[in-house]
A protein has these predicted regions:
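Condensing-enzyme catalytic core mediating Claisen C-C bond formation in acyl metabolism
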Residues: 1-48, 152-216, 220-223, 257-264, ...
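Active-site-proximal gating segment of KS-fold condensing enzymes and close homologs
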Residues: 49-56, 79-125, 162-165, 171-172, ...
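Gly/Ser/Thr-rich loops at beta-strand to alpha-helix junctions
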Residues: 87-91, 111-115, 140-144, 233-239, ...
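Generic structural signal for well-ordered, non-membrane alpha-helical segments
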Residues: 9, 51-58, 62, 111-115, ...
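Conserved active-site "lid/cap" helical segment
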Residues: 1-83, 87-94, 100, 209-226, ...
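Short acidic, glycine/serine/threonine-rich loops at helix termini
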Residues: 27-29, 93-95, 145-151, 242-244, ...
């Protein structure tokens, strides 16, 4: 492991070994729904609350990663650590999920960038021989997030066109020193305040943080955007993606022909009632696991930059008219030759 520049790390022996994805009914009806390992038929998944549904989704993603690992191992594999994050207060879904597992646990929170944060931490630990198998995971549920950050689900208030619809999705993967896709570098983001106060327009506050991390990554690694086949962002959706491209172009970085935003793609914006697209920690966890990693394995892409985008929204601070800061973390995945 080598530190590169101010914020980046180059890895020598970190891989994604197994993965699993699960999504909700509306997400399954979207353009990438068929790529998910499993989908729900309703918002409860047999439980009596939305929170319990989200716990069940994240648990199932973890369980199936372990099942897949058992299928390729001669003996029952040991999970050395789990690193999870979600959008609920005190990352409640992650904490309650972990009650089932007698495994060391780190809970993380970078809002919708939590999944990439967990992968970065897991990669650092694997590189430093903390263990052989570390599970990273994240989730979101439309109804838990609406209640958490905006209004009660029964409120029924009107929303602006630039509003984003929280995806119901969960993903987990296993970071190891062997695997199918290599994780070659990462860039840890900084908290950026763009003086944005509208909790309905989170992509606007996330786009500058995303741009900052991309610029820092290219500078730290002395790289060009031409070195990457695809630039994947978490949940900027339609409007935030436009802002990101404009900011980067001002810095001489053109991603117009290679940008893929998970929030913009997880739904069909033109035919589904999702306003300007999707958001939530499950966006990047679901789409990365269900679609992007498989495209690398199949040889469609050689090198991909993936950026988790997190708006650090706090309802109390918003009620005090404080601006909403944001953070973005970045990893690079490469195909094995």
């Amino acid at each position: 492991m080598i530190k590169a520049g101010n914020n980046s790390i180059i890895f020598k022996n970190v891989y994604i070994r197994e993965k699993y994805s699960i999504c909700g009914k509306l997400e399954f009806a979207g353009p990438y729904g068929s790529f998910f390992d499993k989908h729900l038929d309703d918002n409860y998944y047999g439980e009596d609350s939305f929170e319990k549904c989200e716990i069940k989704m994240l648990t199932e993603a973890i369980d199936n990663c372990i099942i897949k690992l058992k299928g390729i191992a001669d003996t029952t594999p040991k999970i050395d650590l789990m690193i999870l994050g979600d959008l609920n207060n005190q990352i409640a879904v992650s904490n309650y999920t972990m009650k089932k597992y007698q495994v060391p646990f780190l809970g993380v929170y970078s809002a919708c960038a939590s999944y990439i944060e967990s992968i970065i931490i897991g990669s650092i630990l694997i590189e430093n021989k903390f263990g052989n198998n570390i599970i990273c995971g994240s989730s979101s549920h439309n109804s838990t997030s609406e209640r958490q950050f905006r209004n009660p689900n029964e409120y029924g208030g009107q929303k602006p066109d630039y509003f984003t619809f929280t995806a119901t999705s969960a993903g987990a993967l296993i970071i190891s020193n062997i695997g199918k896709v290599k994780l070659t570098s990462c860039t840890i983001g900084k908290v950026i305040d763009f003086n944005q106060i509208d909790p309905n327009d989170l992509p606007r506050t996330m786009a500058p943080a995303c741009a900052d991390t991309i610029i820092e990554h290219l500078r730290d690694l002395n790289a060009s955007i031409k070195d990457y086949d695809l630039v994947v962002t978490g949940d900027l959706s339609k409007n935030g993606s436009k802002i990101l491209k404009e900011i980067l172009l001002e810095h001489g970085i053109d991603i117009y022909d290679k940008h893929f935003d998970c929030g913009e793609q997880i739904f069909d914006i033109n035919s589904q009632p999702v306003y300007s697209g999707g958001s939530g920690a499950g966006c990047i966890a679901g789409i990365l696991n269900a679609y992007i990693i498989n495209k690398i394995i199949k040889g469609c892409y050689k090198k991909i930059m993936i950026i988790g985008t997190g708006a650090l929204l706090n309802p109390v601070m918003c009620s005090q008219k404080e601006p909403i800061p944001s953070i973005s973390h970045l990893i690079v995945l490469e195909r094995l030759e």
